[in-house]
Swiss-Prot record:
The gene is HTD2. Present with 799 molecules/cell in log phase SD medium. Keywords: Lyase, Mitochondrion, NAD, Oxidoreductase. Mitochondrial 3-hydroxyacyl-thioester dehydratase involved in fatty acid biosynthesis. Required for respiratory growth and for normal mitochondrial morphology. This is Hydroxyacyl-thioester dehydratase type 2, mitochondrial. Its EC number is 4.2.1.-. Gene3D superfamilies: Hotdog Thioesterase. GO terms for molecular function: (3R)-hydroxyacyl-[acyl-carrier-protein] dehydratase activity; oxidoreductase activity.
Amino acid sequence: MKSKTWIFRDVLSSHRTKAFDSLLCRRLPVSKATKHLQLGEHFLFFPPSFEKLDRDGYFNYQNPASLLGNPDLRYRRRIWGQGELVQYLPVTLDQEYTCHESIKYVKKIRDEHVVCIERTLLQERPENVSSPMDICLFERRVLMYTNSPANKTAVKMPVGEENYKILKNFTVTDMDIVAYGQMSLNPHRIHWDKEYSRYVEGYDDIIMQGPFSVQLLQKCIQPFLEQPIRQLRYRNLNYIYPNTTLSICQSLSSSSGMYTFQIRDLQKANLVYMKADVFC
């Protein structure tokens, strides 16, 4: 695979972050007024500037067929599996930033392909400064491309395996999912087209976006932390359908400087949607 890098520019409008707050304001406290982007809010910005989409409605430049130059590689679903965010410098709202996106690797695992994407958020510096760019934020995301239908049986954790406390409960609606897709300019059909989701990819309904669940987690846990989050590693374990009541939980085994959180199902104690390690 040839090295591939794309560059996107965007103005980080405070109107868009306020729109995200407004989406949740009746169920979650409004974030404190700040001039800076919160960790994870960059997901609302830097949409790819390509017109060509795959049949699932998402951009095709990152799929294995495009990256490996093999048009015979077909897939039924793409899944947002896991990722990492690292904050190096404050990111100021209503300023223009540059996003450098590159492919770290493409791996074939059995009949599936895994694509690891890295994004670096940069701010241009004055001409009289030796280094022309400051690295403000690093992101890694891992997508899986598969031909298998969506699992009807959720991955479950044994009850009592971990001790945790519930910080917040939140019920996600279908309109939350649709509205978030509009805010983040995400055209992926599994987030708005119920017929496609059911009859093509095999889900029971539309599903919540991976970035949305990361932002929801951050918004719920930050008030309980003494310092801003500087690093977050997460793994998605199950799909989140509309009208699911989520419990944002903190593991009681968290160590100094590192906290472990989960997004669980309120009604089904052994159903975990996300696990995340957070460093402050």
